[in-house]
């Protein structure tokens, strides 16, 4: 008799996706982050659901409802801190997953990559609207500053901002709709994840060498299920250490004060995972220019397949491209640091240099390195 997992209409799909899936035999720990992101998403949806049971999306009670969750709800403090720090783990895994894709040339699976970029934008939007919900000082002013950026759009900007606000300032209507968006977006993300996996399973996984692995495949289970389980345990350990020992390490102290529309906080800054983009936004003195640079800093990922000039897919055997990749990583860390600093010298000039070099590395230097490596590998006799 044929195994049920191979014949049952639903189990057959699960079997082909997670059990009998042919996977390259040489994929490293850098391929763990996809499954970790799936677990992060599940965890965020579950903790978020329990938080939504006790949260009230009203300017008068939002802040105190979060305090009530932490003080009076059974394990409410744990659920809230897991949700807040879970977002940080989510972005940590996202950035490493994207970095892996760039290093090993996974972006050449264009459909999978493009859905991935859309996923990144959707997750960023979800995190932004979620940060507004506790209705602390940084929530309120962050919402005001970021939504105000849309006013840079010619002709329709101001109307668009007021339409998003639901009035003439960030108020009750804004909070209510942001809660609605924050609730629905994770389910849209889940649907996009399924499309992402659908396209990935059309081609199969890439591998560190970048060479077609069809001649040497192994089943996903038990080899990669056990490997993913190890990655999961390490991630959960990190998350629990963060949540139980220093839950507020990545939070802004200003957000522990209720929103005061009349009192401006000394420095407006987003969560750490948005700081690199915020630094690029601030490095351009012109408002519209800053908004366009902010968009370009993420959307440039869509151009990665077009900017690939090397004859080899992966950077595994390309030392010049490797060097540029790690310079780009360091550059992003500098931008993250600058995003959290006040707008004054020397931070302003460092941010401007880092912003220019970010685009220069991706658009000019990395494609040039690809051409140069191709030339160096040509026989000269």
Swiss-Prot record:
> One GO MF term, please?
metal ion binding
**Keywords from the UniProt entry:** Electron transport, Heme, Iron, Membrane, Metal-binding, Mitochondrion, Mitochondrion inner membrane, Respiratory chain, Transmembrane, Transmembrane helix, Transport, Ubiquinone
One of the record's GO cellular component terms: respiratory chain complex III
Q: How is the cofactor bound?
A: Binds 2 heme b groups non-covalently.
Q: Does the keyword Acetylation apply?
A: no
Source organism, top-level taxon: Eukaryota
Q: Which cofactor does it need?
A: heme b
Q: For this UniProt entry, what is the primary localization, expressed as one broad class?
A: mitochondrion
Specify whether Iron is a keyword of the entry. Answer: yes
> Where is this protein localized, as stated in its record?
Mitochondrion inner membrane
- What does the record list as GO biological process? mitochondrial electron transport, ubiquinol to cytochrome c
SUPFAM superfamilies from the entry? a domain/subunit of cytochrome bc1 complex (Ubiquinol-cytochrome c reductase), Transmembrane di-heme cytochromes
TM helices/strands, residue ranges? 33-53, 77-98, 113-133, 178-198, 226-246, 288-308, 320-340, 347-367
- Membrane association type: Multi-pass membrane protein
User: Other remarks?
Assistant: Heme 1 (or BL or b562) is low-potential and absorbs at about 562 nm, and heme 2 (or BH or b566) is high-potential and absorbs at about 566 nm.
Q: What does the subunit section of this Swiss-Prot or TrEMBL entry state?
A: The cytochrome bc1 complex contains 11 subunits: 3 respiratory subunits (MT-CYB, CYC1 and UQCRFS1), 2 core proteins (UQCRC1 and UQCRC2) and 6 low-molecular weight proteins (UQCRH/QCR6, UQCRB/QCR7, UQCRQ/QCR8, UQCR10/QCR9, UQCR11/QCR10 and a cleavage product of UQCRFS1). This cytochrome bc1 complex then forms a dimer.
Under PANTHER family, the record lists: CYTOCHROME B
Q: Which family does it belong to?
A: Belongs to the cytochrome b family.
Purpose: Component of the ubiquinol-cytochrome c reductase complex (complex III or cytochrome b-c1 complex) that is part of the mitochondrial respiratory chain. The b-c1 complex mediates electron transfer from ubiquinol to cytochrome c. Contributes to the generation of a proton gradient across the mitochondrial membrane that is then used for ATP synthesis.
Protein name according to UniProt:
Cytochrome b
What organism does the record attribute this protein to?
Trichosurus vulpecula
